[in-house]
Amino acid sequence: MRIAITTPTGNIGRELTKRLLDQRGTQLILLARTPDKLKKEQARGAKVVKADLGDAASVKKATQGADALFFLCPPSFAVPNYRAYYVGLAKNGAEAVKANKVKHTVLLSSVGAHLSKGTGPILGLYDAEKIFSKATQGLTILRPTWFMENHLWHLDEIKNMNSIFMPLSGNLKAPMIATVDVADRAARVITGPAPSRPTIVPLHGPKDYSLDECAKIIGRAIGKEVRHVQVPPAKAKEAMIGMGATENVADTMLEMYAAFQAGTLKDEAKRSPETTTPTTFETFVKNVLLPALKG
């Protein structure tokens, strides 16, 4: 089975690649802007193809001969319009799927992608789901919730100020998931049979966590108190632009945060044993966040 993977150096793509390289009967095609970053994977038998998801011809050529495709729209703070950026990538991917008759596509989407307004960058994934659904019936849509890895954006704040600054209240609770668990489910799905029509797979992590609770867990792990601090949206926007975000990206992120705060950005599916995944926030902190703090 020949499986093409986009963004193979990202958190999810990297873990998915590891899992599939360990499985017999899979041949991987890794689409990468910088193939040199994948020498280890190439040495293990993966075919590494230089490709740019923003170039339709490049994606089409790279996915020739693929039986399945894992498609992830990589986030970018530098784009002038976040939604248009996602739509462009999705169109390129969908055209490649249709042209190359890829039997099974696994699209990484997001919680809230069923909503047509008010969700900021997730609106681009709402569009992406529609675009791929028109291109193929063999589509599995993964809708994970809030990534635990989002806390990695706050490493400097944790190190230097023992705080995490966000435009959200500390008592806000949300399901959170580790990207390793998303990769686990993606590996299971993409090596299974293709669906006969577009199918949605919600992923809710182990439980709901409040942001105050996350700060306390991090504090216990590093041996000092860490606080969650709610900041005004204007301060959050200033910080994002300082990190390189365009004004449009910052505004769409604030729209998403506002939807989380209001409780309108939530999954239409209820938690179940099938949507619950094993990695706890404590395990994420131990295995991922602590090494990142020390690194």
Where are these regions (language model features)?
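Oxidoreductase cofactor-interface core, primarily capturing Rossmann-like NAD(P)-dependent enzymes
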Residues: M1-E41, G54-A57, Q64, A68, ...
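Glycine-enriched alpha-helix->loop->beta-strand junction motifs that scaffold or abut catalytic
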Residues: G45-A46
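Cofactor-binding loops of NAD(P)H-dependent oxidoreductases
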Residues: A51
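Aromatic "clamp/platform" in nucleotide-sugar-dependent glycosyltransferases that forms part
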Residues: Y85-A90
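Structural motif detector for alpha-helix initiation sites
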Residues: T179, L211, P233, T280-F281
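A generic structural motif
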Residues: V229-V231
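A hydrophobic C-terminal alpha-helical subdomain
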Residues: A234-G295
